[in-house]
Amino acid sequence: MPPTVRQGIRTVGTLRVTRPSSYVLSSREFSVLNRPPPNYPGHIPLTTIERGALAVGSAIGSLLNPRRADLIAALGEATATPYFIYRLRDAMLSNPTGRRILRDRPRISSKTLSVEYLRSLPPNSVGRTYVNWLDREGVGPDSRETVRYIDDEECAYVMQRYRECHDFYHAVTGLPIVVEGEVALKTFEFANTLLPMTGLSMFAVMRLKPEERERYWELHLPWAVRSGLASKEVINVYWEEELERDVNELREKLGIEKPPDLREIRKMMRRQKKAAEAAREKYQN
């Protein structure tokens, strides 16, 4: 047998041996009565029917109540496979910083990020901007759900990383956690990551007030599409190494355009509404 043929056979054999466990799991039929063992701590293998039911149920539930973070997390996991989470993982593998993140497996939590250290950073630094945003919104870095329904262990980490970095995206864009702000940020994330859950979250526009919907269509949707497509893939940002950098410098480096301050817009609209009501009452009296 020619050497090139032997080498080709060895290569194919290696590829077969090193197929990810998720491929083996997804290609092997099972039922709720003979569920395979988990691929990582906390992993729950799902049948195709179970995954579909989880996607539909969590989509309906999160649309009815956009504040249910657990349902949004389940929707993200149920719809990320078989293609989208692998595309995001491959985007990390094709980037030097993304590869380091996959190798190091950093986690973002109150145990890994010192709030006191973040508050000691210069006012316009990434870390200070992040902790100021956490304080203003009344949230913390430990509020993210743990990934359970993605079969491949490495892809599960990619989803966990995306989830734990979400508040950094909030901080650098300045968008608050009100539904209007979340929909705007999810639209940006969809343009940047292509994760289906981020796109499906746009249906929450239907739950916005008329003036909020108008702002979304005229202001936030164009910004999100423009900035999300033009910027570098945010999954490849090693946030732990960017904490001391000037936040404006980081935005410029990533190509992220900061949207108008939504909190200030909402405050201004409330003031105008109160002034109009007071003027109307004065006129009627």
From Swiss-Prot:
Keyword Mitochondrion: yes
UniProt-listed Pfam families: Coq4
Keywords: Lyase, Membrane, Metal-binding, Mitochondrion, Mitochondrion inner membrane, Transit peptide, Ubiquinone biosynthesis, Zinc
Entry's Gene Ontology BP terms: ubiquinone biosynthetic process
Pathway named in the protein's UniProt entry: Cofactor biosynthesis; ubiquinone biosynthesis
GO CC field: extrinsic component of mitochondrial inner membrane
Reaction catalyzed: a 4-hydroxy-3-methoxy-5-(all-trans-polyprenyl)benzoate + H(+) = a 2-methoxy-6-(all-trans-polyprenyl)phenol + CO2
Domain of life: Eukaryota
Membrane-topology annotation of the record: Peripheral membrane protein
Locations listed in the record: Mitochondrion inner membrane
EC numbers: 4.1.1.130
Family the entry assigns: Belongs to the COQ4 family.
The protein's name: Ubiquinone biosynthesis protein COQ4, mitochondrial
Organism of origin: Paracoccidioides brasiliensis (strain Pb18)
Upper lineage: Eukaryota, Fungi, Dikarya, Ascomycota, Pezizomycotina
Gene it is expressed from: COQ4
